[in-house]
UniProtKB/Swiss-Prot annotation:
GO MF, any single term: structural constituent of ribosome
Protein name: Small ribosomal subunit protein bS16
GO cellular component, one term: small ribosomal subunit
UniProt entry tagged with the keyword Ribonucleoprotein: yes
InterPro entries registered for this protein in UniProt: Ribosomal_bS16, Ribosomal_bS16_CS, Ribosomal_bS16_dom_sf
Protein encoded by which gene: rpsP
Length: 93
């Protein structure tokens, strides 16, 4: 199963994270399929960059976001766009 999750990057005690699509059986920092964004919680406010179009693609292909990534997607409205896209596809079918 493909998951959208965080992989840790950055120096010791200065974590930053990449938002990636990867197989759920891979280790946290293992081989990823695609980089979908970046999250730096240490800045004030936290720095977040998202490739919205690619995230929507992976969600439409059945990728499951982790709880942390889901909260980020909800905060930036990507999850709502996915639900609307899913609902419109269901009603037109």
């Amino acid at each position: 199963m493909v998951k959208i999750r965080l992989t840790r990057v950055g120096a010791k005690n200065k974590p930053a994270y990449r938002i990636v699509a990867m197989d759920s059986r891979e280790p946290r920092d293992g081989k990823h399929l695609e980089i979908l964004g970046f999250y730096d919680p240490k800045t004030d406010p936290a720095t977040i960059q998202l490739k919205e179009e690619r995230i929507l693609y992976w969600l439409s292909q059945g990728a499951q976001p982790t709880d942390t990534v889901l909260s980020i997607l909800k905060r930036y409205g990507v999850w709502d766009k996915f639900l609307a896209m899913k609902k419109s596809a269901k009603s037109s079918a």
